[in-house]
Curated annotation (Swiss-Prot):
It holds the Pfam family TIR_2. It comes from Rattus norvegicus. Residues 159-293 form the TIR domain. The intermediate domain (ID) is required for the phosphorylation and activation of IRAK. The gene is Myd88. Keywords: Cytoplasm, Immunity, Inflammatory response, Innate immunity, Nucleus, Phosphoprotein, Ubl conjugation. Homodimer. Also forms heterodimers with TIRAP. Binds to TLR2, TLR4, IRAK1, IRAK2 and IRAK4 via their respective TIR domains. Interacts with IL18R1. Interacts with BMX, IL1RL1, IKBKE and IRF7. Interacts with LRRFIP1 and LRRFIP2; this interaction positively regulates Toll-like receptor (TLR) signaling in response to agonist. Interacts with FLII. LRRFIP1 and LRRFIP2 compete with FLII for MYD88-binding. Interacts with IRF1. Upon IL1B treatment, forms a complex with PELI1, IRAK1, IRAK4 and TRAF6; this complex recruits MAP3K7/TAK1, TAB1 and TAB2 to mediate NF-kappa-B activation. Ubiquitinated; undergoes 'Lys-63'-linked polyubiquitination. OTUD4 specifically hydrolyzes 'Lys-63'-linked polyubiquitinated MYD88. Deubiquitinated by USP3 that cleaves 'Lys-63'-linked ubiquitin chains leading to inhibition of MYD88-induced NF-kappa-B signaling. It comes from the Eukaryota. This is Myeloid differentiation primary response protein MyD88.
Length: 296
């Protein structure tokens, strides 16, 4: 927090902090933020005021009130939303006249951010050149050489992904949340989402087969009532299962994200699912899914 960035009141926030995700802040800083913001007082803005500025609605704030550490829960929930960053957090605290927090924690925040940047740079320097993570990933036919937005048109360096997302158009909002939680956070996974990543003009069945078998290490199936009516999803699921008989390679991961009126598909019942509808395990949902997708 120096003189080099946007100014809010008497506080100047370094511009680079707006590009850092909230995961850059370590446990110590978060605990100190809780000590400042958890107490309810009329003398200064508390965590509820911050939650409103972050865009959370009344019922969401009431849910945070039931948590032992509402500030921690608030930060965990906000860091998965678009627009969240270290810089934006500091900006909101300044707007709420909580400059006392900024002055108290500025050195520790700066230290966390610099450490995060160094770790990211180290990971990038140690990362090998992109190689095929799935055997035989080079397309065998020219028409499958340029099927995704970042593909080499000549087919020499095909775009690779951590997971193919099998979903119905009606479930796109949950898929977008998946993108925010898994790609735009510290997990930094790379998902293949057809509506975003696949170029038009090629047979959908050929594209799906190529991506699932040769470009993606896993496949996530977003199961819903509409999924059960989709011939395309049915093909993708059965094709993925055929590549891993008995699910020995943990290739396919079913997700149930909302209540269903119809029975869960029988071909997926023998696979452990990620259940977003279970309130008791919802807080672990994204961590479990991310770790499953990160397995070698």
């Amino acid at each position: 927090m120096s003189a080099g960035g946007p100014r809010v009141g008497s506080v100047s926030v370094d511009s680079y902090l707006f590009s850092l995700p909230l995961v850059a802040l370590n446990v110590g800083v978060r605990r100190r933020l809780s000590l400042f913001l958890n107490p309810r007082t009329t003398a200064a803005a508390d965590w509820t005021s911050l939650a409103e500025e972050m865009g959370f609605e009344y019922l969401e704030i009431r849910e945070f009130e039931t948590r032992p550490d509402p500030t921690r829960s608030l930060l965990d929930a906000w860091q998965g939303r678009s627009g969240s960053s270290v810089g934006r957090l500091l900006e909101l605290l300044a707007l709420l006249d909580r400059e006392d927090i900024l002055y108290e924690l500025k050195d520790r925040i700066e230290e966390d951010c610099q450490k995060y940047i160094r770790n990211q740079q180290k990971q990038e320097s140690e990362k090998p050149l992109q190689v095929a993570r799935v055997e035989s990933s080079v397309p065998q036919t020219k028409e499958l050489g340029g099927i995704t937005t970042l593909d080499d048109p000549l087919g020499q360096t095909p775009e690779l992904f951590d997971a193919f997302i099998c979903y119905c158009p009606s479930d796109i909002e949950f898929v977008q949340e998946m993108i925010r939680q898994l790609e735009q956070t510290d997990y930094r996974l790379k998902l293949c989402v057809s509506d975003r990543d696949v170029l038009p003009g090629t047979c959908v069945w050929s594209i799906a087969s190529e991506l699932i078998e040769k470009r993606c290490r896993r496949m996530v199936v977003v199961v819903s009532d509409d999924y059960l009516q989709s011939k395309e999803c049915d093909f993708q699921t059965k094709f993925a299962l055929s590549l891993s008989p008995g699910v020995q390679q943990k290739r396919l991961i079913p997700i149930k994200y909302k209540a269903m009126k119809k029975d869960f598909p029988s071909i997926l019942r023998f696979i452990t699912i990620c259940d977003y509808t279970n309130p008791c395990t919802k807080s672990w949902f994204w961590t479990r899914l991310a770790k499953a997708l990160s397995l070698p």
